[in-house]
Design a protein with these regions (language model features):
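Small-aliphatic-rich amphipathic alpha-helix that forms the alpha element of a beta-alpha
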Residues: 29, 33, 101, 106-152
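Short beta-strand segments
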Residues: 31, 36-37, 43-46
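A glycine-rich helix N-cap at a beta->alpha junction
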Residues: 67-73, 80, 152-171
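Solvent-exposed alpha-helices and their adjacent loops that cap or buttress functional pockets
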Residues: 39-42, 92-95, 156-162
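Glycine/small-residue-rich phosphate/adenosyl-binding loop
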Residues: 42-116
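Residue-level "edge-of-site" marker
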Residues: 46, 140, 166
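Specificity-determining recognition surfaces
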Residues: 1-27, 43, 165-171
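Short, cationic motifs built from Arg/Lys/His that form the positively charged side of catalytic pockets
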Residues: 10-14, 34, 56
């Protein structure tokens, strides 16, 4: 696919089929993320892919737990594919995606958030190229800054000084 066609085709998708993506496709998507431009060429991003549906759902619920959606009353994202802002009955910020990639970056690095979102966008473009749906989700740090979320960071061996910056939903 030509680059500009790819960019035009990439959309945020919030509806997913009930099937897991292929491991080979996931590896290509992660590699695309790790090749993203970043400040100083430091390649500091850490990506954790979650393919367990129950865990994706749990983390998705943590993702919106501290988010005051009522403060955005009147905001509008999409009637075709409602977001958590459009539909308060949505209980997971991950919309049932079968695979969720958490993108981590250094907590005290000025360009950490920008670097993470460059990584995430490369991943979303790669997913589009492979014919997969994707959506970028913010509120990374808040997702794990709580009693149920913090143990996952230890389980995934995320270094001290790193925080989740964003998520890439894939399906």
């Amino acid at each position: 696919m030509e680059f500009f066609d790819l960019v035009k085709r990439r959309r945020s998708i919030r509806k997913y089929q009930d099937r897991q993506i292929e491991r080979g496709d996931l590896e290509k998507i992660i590699q695309a993320g790790l090749c993203a431009p970043n400040a100083g060429g430091g390649q500091r991003a850490i990506i954790v892919a979650v393919r367990n549906r129950a865990l994706c759902e749990k983390i998705g619920r943590l993702n919106i737990a501290k988010f005051n959606r009522n403060s955005l009353a009147g905001s509008y994202v999409s009637s075709e594919q409602p977001s958590i802002i459009d539909d308060l009955s949505i209980r997971s910020g991950f919309y049932g995606a079968p695979t969720v990639c958490a993108v981590f970056g250094p907590k005290n690095f000025l360009y950490s958030v920008a670097d993470a979102f460059c990584c995430a966008e490369n991943m979303a473009l790669a997913a589009t190229e492979l014919g997969l749906a994707s959506c970028l989700i913010a509120r990374g740090e808040e997702t794990f800054d709580n009693e149920p979320g913090a143990p996952l960071l230890k389980e995934w061996r995320i270094p001290d000084g790193y925080v989740a910056r964003c998520f890439v939903l894939l399906g």
